[in-house]
Amino acid sequence: MDYGKTLTQSLLSNGADKRENKMAFNPSVFKQHFPYLQQADAVVYLDSAATALKPQVLTDATIAFYQSAGSVHRSQYDEKQTALFEQARENVKNFIGAESEETIIWTSGTTHAINCVARGLSHQLHPKAEIIISEADHHANFVTWSEIARQYGATLHILPINEQWLIEEQDLIAVLNTNTVLVALNMVSNVTGTEQPVANLIKLIRQHSHALVLVDAAQAISHLPIDLQRLDADFIAFSAHKLYGPNGLGVLSGKRHALEQLHPLLYGGKMVERVSAQHIRFAELPYRLEAGTPNIAGVIGFNAVLEWLSQWDLTAAEQHAIALAEQCKMRLKNYPHCQLFLSPQPSSIVCFVFNGIATSDIATLLAEQNIALRAGEHCAQPYLARLGQHSTLRLSFAPYNQQADVDAFFSALDNALALLD
C-alpha cells in the first residue's frame, strides 16, 4: 500500500493538497529544531503517540509572551498579543479545513473538548435517546459517553471491532435509527495506529439517521491531513501537544449549526455580552464556549508551531516515521514469542507483546538503557480487552526519529530479553 494513501487520506484529497509544495523534508534537519534531542543525555524517544516533543519555536514564542505585558481582548496595550491569539484560530482553521475562525474553540485538551460536546448536548438526551461509540475508543470518548448515557437514561451502543480492529459498516447500520442523537468515532487508534474509515462511516450515518457525529482526532492530527468540511463531521476534537504544541491546550471545532446547539460547559467572564439581574445574554461563537481567562501562552505558542509546520512537507515527514515503524514490525516478526497487533494500513505505531513476559519488565529494562516507549493500557481498556491483553508495549515514531533510534531499540531489546530469559 502507498504510505501516502491510507483510507481517510485517499478520501480527503483536499487535505493532502495542503501539504504539497513545502520545503523538502530532511529528518536530520527536522530533528535539529527540537532542543531536547540535542541534549547529551536525551533518551531514545519512541513515545510520540503519548505526546510529541517540542520545537524551539514553541519555547521562543512562550517566553516572548511571558516577557510581555497584558492579556488579550482587554485593552489597547495588548493588541499585539490579541492579534497573535486570533491568528492562531485562523491557522487552526486552515490546518483542519474548518468553516471559519469562529468555529475554533479553545479547550484544555481533547478530553475537555469531548466533554464540552457531551455536556453541551445533554439537554437533547432522554430515556429514548441513543448514543453510539465503539471498542476502538480512547477513554476520553468511551468513559464520557458511557457516563452521560447513564446519567440521562439514554441507550448506549458499543460497536465491536473486527480482527483488523475496524468498525464493520453493517454493525453501525444495525444500530442507527431516528433516536440516535450522536455517534462518536475515533479516527486513529492510539493503541495500534489503525485508521478507521471515518469518511465512509459518516456517509452511512447521514443515510440512516439524523445523528450528530463527533470525531476524536487526537491521534490523527499529527498523522493525517484533515479537511473538516469534506469529512462532514459535526464536531472534531484534538490536543495541541500531539502536534508539537503545548500541554493544556486543545481544540473543539465543527459545523457552526452544531456548535450553536451546545450549552456552555462553563460559565463566567468573556462568554457573555450582557448581564443583569433579570437576563444574561451569551456571546456569539467562539467566545460563548470559552469562559474564563484562556490559555493565552499556549495559544500563542501553538500559533508559532503551526506557522513553523506550514514550511514542511508533512506527507513526506509522515512517510519517514511510517517507514521506521514498518521496519520495526518486520524485525519484530523474527523474535520468538513476539505477538504483533498490526493495523491494516501502514502506521507509525507498533503494538506488541512478548508472550510470557510482563510488559512492565521489558519497559523497565529498556528504560534503564535510555529507551522511552510505552507499556500499559494506553487509556483504552476495552480496546485491549478486544486484543485479549491487559497491557501491551507500544513504539510510536515521529519525523524527528532516525534509523539510529531503531537500531538502539533493538540492541536494548536484545539485552533485555537476554536478562529475562
From Swiss-Prot:
Query: InterPro entries given for it?
Result: Aminotrans_V_dom, Cysteine_dSase, PyrdxlP-dep_Trfase, PyrdxlP-dep_Trfase_major, PyrdxlP-dep_Trfase_small
Catalytic reaction(s) noted: (sulfur carrier)-H + L-cysteine = (sulfur carrier)-SH + L-alanine
N6-(pyridoxal phosphate)lysine-modified residues are 242
Q: What is its EC number?
A: 2.8.1.7
Which keywords accompany this UniProt record? Pyridoxal phosphate, Transferase
Which co-factor is required? pyridoxal 5'-phosphate
The molecular function terms of the Gene Ontology recorded here are: cysteine desulfurase activity
Q: Which domain of life is it from?
A: Bacteria
Record bears the keyword Transferase = yes
Does the entry feature the keyword Transferase, yes or no? Answer: yes
Q: Of which family is this protein a member? A: Belongs to the class-V pyridoxal-phosphate-dependent aminotransferase family. Csd subfamily.
Give the protein's function: Catalyzes the removal of elemental sulfur and selenium atoms from L-cysteine, L-cystine, L-selenocysteine, and L-selenocystine to produce L-alanine.
Which protein is depicted?
Probable cysteine desulfurase
Task: Write down the species.
Answer: Pasteurella multocida (strain Pm70)
- GN (gene name): csd
